Amino acid sequence: MKTYVAKPESVVHDWFIVDAAGKTLGRLSAEIASRLRGKHKPEFTPHVDTGDYIIVINAAKVRVTGNKATDKVYYHHTNFAGGIKSITFDKLIEKAPERTIQTAVKGMLPKGPLGYAMFKKLKVYAGAEHPHAAQQPKELNI
């Protein structure tokens, strides 16, 4: 019996919505990354984007365990000499709550063109409102 290999044109990408309120950041991000990659589908193929679209709402209400709220530091560089910037989880969740989930999920996806295409299927919103009602997303309990 031959091994099934998914073709990019035959893959069906579904839309799912996840409520991040009260969920742990790492556990939530790991499941989202797995679904963006398509590992939950029987037709998963490593070199084809078989994953689904994921909408995350209430990103501002995600939680972390232990002292990570004050100790976890996010770094980015401005591309100017000496331009490394840092911000703690507490400050980032106030300033841009979407970035906490995006950063966690991006680190769990493959690096390269396929991983970047998978990451584009992630839509994160700080509040409960999202503009994707036309896609009729299904509720996903994680």
Curated annotation (Swiss-Prot):
Subunit structure: Part of the 50S ribosomal subunit.
Keywords tagged on the record: Ribonucleoprotein, Ribosomal protein
Record's keyword annotation contains Secreted: no
Gene Ontology BP term (one): translation
Source species, domain of life: Bacteria
Keyword DNA damage annotated: no
CC per GO annotation: cytosolic large ribosomal subunit
Function: This protein is one of the early assembly proteins of the 50S ribosomal subunit, although it is not seen to bind rRNA by itself. It is important during the early stages of 50S assembly.
Single Gene Ontology MF annotation: structural constituent of ribosome
Assigned protein family: Belongs to the universal ribosomal protein uL13 family.
InterPro entries: Ribosomal_uL13, Ribosomal_uL13_bac-type, Ribosomal_uL13_sf
Gene: rplM
Classification via NCBIfam families: rplM_bact
Name of the protein described by the UniProt record: Large ribosomal subunit protein uL13
HAMAP family per the UniProt record, alphabetical: Ribosomal_uL13
